[in-house]
Amino acid sequence: MAKRIVGSTPKQDGFRMPGEFEPQEKVWMIWPERPDNWRDGGKPVQEAFTNVAKAISQFTPMNVVVSQQQFQNCRRQLPPEITVYEMSNNDAWVRDCGPSFVINDHGEIRGVDWTFNAWGGLVDGLYFPWDQDDLVAQKICEIEHVDSYRTDDFVLEGGSFHVDGQGTVLTTEMCLLSEGRNPQLSKEAIEQKLCDYLNVEKVLWLGDGIDPEETNGHVDDVACFIAPGEVACIYTEDQNSPFYEAAQDAYQRLLKMTDAKGRQLKVHKLCCPVKNVTIKGSFKIDFVEGTMPREDGDICIASYMNFLITNDGVIVPQYGDENDHLALEQVQTMFPDKKIVGVNTVEVVYGGGNIHCITQQEPKR
């Protein structure tokens, strides 16, 4: 059985969140279906999710959760080696509503169940209701027989931070200090929450993310740890790029930062697409009051940074852009001992996310 842990934190109990580059037991996804977020009733994006899941399963066992209505369709589209569970949900962003797993030095694992409010709640959230998404982390922990910590007084999404597993967390001011999440907490109080529940000693703050309308600037589109003391950061010198200012600011900040161990960060550049990815065929997306509308010509958050590191592989977004191959080469340089797999995720970015957003790794115990 899985129980809730009250009156304590992972830090007090000797649990830490490992870096994404550390060994993984499995990866989780949620099957997409919302017709008010995905084109053509979700059919094109289901193909993209399937391709992402297949790519990951080359390196790590895959679990996919899906609503009752879509169970048979999901099961038919995914190969038999991928496990499928029925689970109610509001949408498909398991990085943000799923558990952040923490481990200790004795082979034990627990989950952190952050309060989820659809990226801003009633202030600027993307949809309502979000109650089923807020239960996903607890349900996954139940399936895995993993005890969990619930942060009832603290809203956070998994895509808003990256850890190095050695005491450092990377995040953005735009997201964590936004009005729709924890307006009752100071920046210092938010830092303390991160330290307590991720078991870190140092918080590295970037400024803005590149998606103010979607997630208020999640860091996983901008930068991530690729190894202890090493980070990747999006980079462009094209001043016409919608990502230029945020990318330049993040890169310059990272160059001056040290981690919790006192190491000067080594910063690797990762290119941006040459052309903007813009929404096409928005008439194929149902309009529903209370859900963020999507219009033709809207610029999507097409970042190569939103990749997933998983055991011996790295799964990287592709957009049919002339920089696709360069991005794969740059990621290969960052991970010389891993296989780099590109997957076209245009349909995913139409809905507001990417590979890292739709996956959640479970570390080895």
Swiss-Prot record:
GO biological process terms held by the UniProt record: putrescine biosynthetic process
Reaction catalysed by this enzyme: agmatine + H2O = N-carbamoylputrescine + NH4(+)
Residues forming coiled coils: none
Annotated GO MF terms: agmatine deiminase activity; protein-arginine deiminase activity
Enzyme class: hydrolase
Alphabetical keyword list: Hydrolase
InterPro entries per UniProt: Agmatine_deiminase (IPR017754), Peptidyl-Arg-deiminase_porph (IPR007466)
Keyword Hydrolase among record annotations: yes
Keyword Cytoplasm: no
Binding locations of agmatine: E214, D220
EC identifiers of the protein: 3.5.3.12
Pfam families per UniProt: PAD_porph (PF04371)
Catalytic site: C357
Oligomeric form and interacting partners: Tetramer of two homodimers.
Family: Belongs to the agmatine deiminase family.
Full protein name: Putative agmatine deiminase
